[in-house]
UniProtKB/Swiss-Prot annotation:
HAMAP family associated with the record: Hfq (MF_00436)
Function description: RNA chaperone that binds small regulatory RNA (sRNAs) and mRNAs to facilitate mRNA translational regulation in response to envelope stress, environmental stress and changes in metabolite concentrations. Also binds with high specificity to tRNAs.
GO molecular function: RNA binding
Protein name per the record: RNA-binding protein Hfq
Residue ranges of domain Sm in the record: 9-68
UniProt keyword terms in alphabetical order: RNA-binding, Stress response
GO terms for cellular component: cytosol
PANTHER family named in the record: RNA-BINDING PROTEIN HFQ (PTHR34772:SF1)
Description of how the protein assembles with itself and partners: Homohexamer.
Domain of life assignment: Bacteria
Family under the similarity heading: Belongs to the Hfq family.
Length: 86
């Protein structure tokens, strides 16, 4: 994982795993709502009544419907560690 994704990936992953509803605002002002189904380096799959592939370069802001707690660096390192290597 590159340094540019050190906050983005855990944030999106927490929203995905906890199925938190989000409002995604695009750079052209359009507001999309749903839950994050999946994401990669370039896109987010947003599910509402249908699934939409939203390109990250078109996103201005991601707003969750409730506050979320991101795992601390030590928690995420423990979660990423392989058994026997911790």
């Amino acid at each position: 994982m590159s340094k540019g994704h050190s906050l983005q990936d855990p944030y999106l992953n927490t929203l995905r795993k906890e199925k938190v509803g989000v409002s995604i605002y695009l750079v052209n002002g359009i507001k999309l709502q749903g839950t994050i189904e999946s994401f990669d380096q370039f896109v987010i799959l947003l599910k509402n009544t249908v699934s939409q592939m939203v390109y990250k370069h078109a996103i201005s802001t991601v707003v969750p419907v409730r506050p979320i707690r991101l795992p601390s660096a030590s928690e995420s390192e423990q979660g990423d560690a392989e058994p026997g290597n911790a």
